[in-house]
Amino acid sequence: MATTGTAAVATGTSTVKRKPVFVKVEQLKPGTTGHTLTVKVIEANIVVPVTRKTRPASSLSRPSQPSRIVECLIGDETGCILFTARNDQVDLMKPGATVILRNSRIDMFKGTMRLGVDKWGRIEATGAASFTVKEDNNLSLVEYELINVGGDQ
């Protein structure tokens, strides 16, 4: 059983890792996961955390640490999308930085796409990219609606 979080195939005594397939921003679709892409951070906006008035009794014994959330506009030469950075990820997502997002997923928020990296994914800082971000193709501005297809209406 692999515990490193990477896809690996056991072949005898050695382990062969699967090569990452890099995708472009314009190829992202709702409800998909496992994306690896190289992007530039265009802007980063802090999201004010919502404080909850009531807490369960089990969580009163430990102090609450406020979570840091930043919505970043990221992109490549094909388009851009909003990325939700949480806690330690916030430090890497500075405007102008180039990062590699590994095993990222598309989350839907109010009918729009957001890119995210959970505990199974990784964000790596990399050298400056040579591409210019195409900001006029923002996939987060496209609103999706779930339509039930069937005869029971």
UniProtKB/Swiss-Prot annotation:
- InterPro entries per record: NA-bd_OB-fold, Ssb-like_OB
CDD domains (UniProt xref): SoSSB_OBF
Q: Which UniProt keywords are given for this protein, alphabetically ordered?
A: Acetylation
CC terms in the record's Gene Ontology section:
plasma membrane
| A Pfam cross-reference name | Ssb-like_OB
Single Gene Ontology MF annotation: mRNA binding
PANTHER family listed in its UniProt record: OB DOMAIN-CONTAINING PROTEIN, OS05G0244600 PROTEIN
Recorded protein name is Uncharacterized protein At4g28440
Gene source species: Arabidopsis thaliana
Q: Lineage in the entry? A: Eukaryota, Viridiplantae, Streptophyta, Embryophyta, Tracheophyta
